[in-house]
Amino acid sequence: MPFFSPEAYFIIFCPHTLAFQAEQQRYLKSLEEKRIFIYFSGKEEEKSRAAEIVKELIAEAKERCVICDPYFSRKDLLNYGIHVTSLDIVLKIITSAAFLKSKVDSEPESRQGDILYEALDSLSKHKINIKCYVLRGKKSPLHDRFIVVDDYVYLLGSSLSEFGSRATTLYRVPDPKFLIRQAERWIKDKTICPLLEEWMKNREVQDDESNNSIWDTRKIGDIS
C-alpha cells in the first residue's frame, strides 16, 4: 500500500478541501479589500503591512479621526500622527495616565508622558494639528484599542506599537455609534480626560481616584 503524507492524502482523496480553502481565502481577501476584517499572521513582514493599513485608514479621514490606545507612545505619534491628510481635521488621541507615568526603557530618567509631550510640542511647530487626551486612573479604564475614522470605528487586536508583530486582527465595528459617542464624551469631560498639557501640570494629583463615571452606562439602543 503506497504511503501518502497528510498533505498528499487531502490533495488526492479530498479535493473538496482544497476548494474550500481557496474559497475561504477569496472570502478573507474580499473582507480585507473592504476593510471589514483583516487577519495578520504575525510573520516578520506583517508588522509593516499592518502599519501601512492603519496609516491608510487615518489618511482617509475627512471629518474626524480619533485614536484610542491606552499605550499610545511617542513612537506611535511619530509613526502615525503625520498621516492625516485633511487640513480640516484635528487628530485626537486618547491614551492613559497609567502608561504615561511609566518609565521609558531606553531613558530610565524619563517618563512616557514627558517624551510624548516633547514630541507633540515639536510637531505642533510644524503646523501639524494634534490633540492628546489622558484618561485618568491608577489603572487604565480603557483596555481595547480602536480608531474612529469619520463614521467608522476599527478595533485593533493590540496596541499600535506592536500591531502586526504577532497574530492579530483589524475589525470594523458593525454599529459604531456607541464607541464614537464614548470617545466624544471622554474628550469633552476634562475632569476624567484632560489634555496632555493640563495633565502634565497635575499628573501626581487625583489620578488614583476611581473612575466610576467614566463610561456611558446607557444601553446602546438608547443612544441616538
Each model region followed by its residue ranges:
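Short hydrophobic beta-strand segments
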Residues: 38-41, 63-68
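Short catalytic-loop micro-motif centered on adjacent basic/acidic residues
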Residues: 65-69, 131-134
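Secondary-structure "cap/kink" motif recognition
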Residues: 57-62
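Short, solvent-exposed loop/turn at the beta-strand->alpha-helix junction
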Residues: 72-75
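PLD/PLD-like phosphodiesterase catalytic module centered on the HKD motif
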Residues: 1-50, 77-224
